[in-house]
Amino acid sequence: MTQQPYYETMYILRPDIPEEEVESHVTKYRDILTEAGAEVLDNQMRGKRRLAYPIAKHKEGIYVQLSHNGDGQQVGVIEKAMRLSEDVIRYLTVKQEGPLPAPRVAPGTEAPAEPEAAAPA
């Protein structure tokens, strides 16, 4: 059996929807992918950000990133659901070369390095 390709779907929700509704959209799209046979690997809320240009008269949007793998049939299913939703103002799915790397730790929050790495004086 060959390895299924990896995909990353980024979508932007309207900025005026409440937080509970944002969570329901995130859950809805995860469930759609799972029911279609894809494996959801990661889901990241990027938060409300300013758009580079207005989309549907909105200057901000709530960004959500969804990483998944499957045979490719699931991409059409989730994009159709997003196209029919009035709360999704933009979406894009790209095929990845491999799984996403582990999340990076923000500077200043990682544990201090071990002293064994220091050169002797």
From Swiss-Prot:
Extent of the signal sequence: none
Does the keyword Glycosyltransferase belong to this entry?
A: no
Q: Where is the composition biased (Low complexity)?
A: 110-121
Q: Which CDD domains match?
A: bS6_chloro_cyano
> SUPFAM superfamilies attached here?
Ribosomal protein S6
GO molecular function annotations of the record: small ribosomal subunit rRNA binding; structural constituent of ribosome
UniProt protein name: Small ribosomal subunit protein bS6
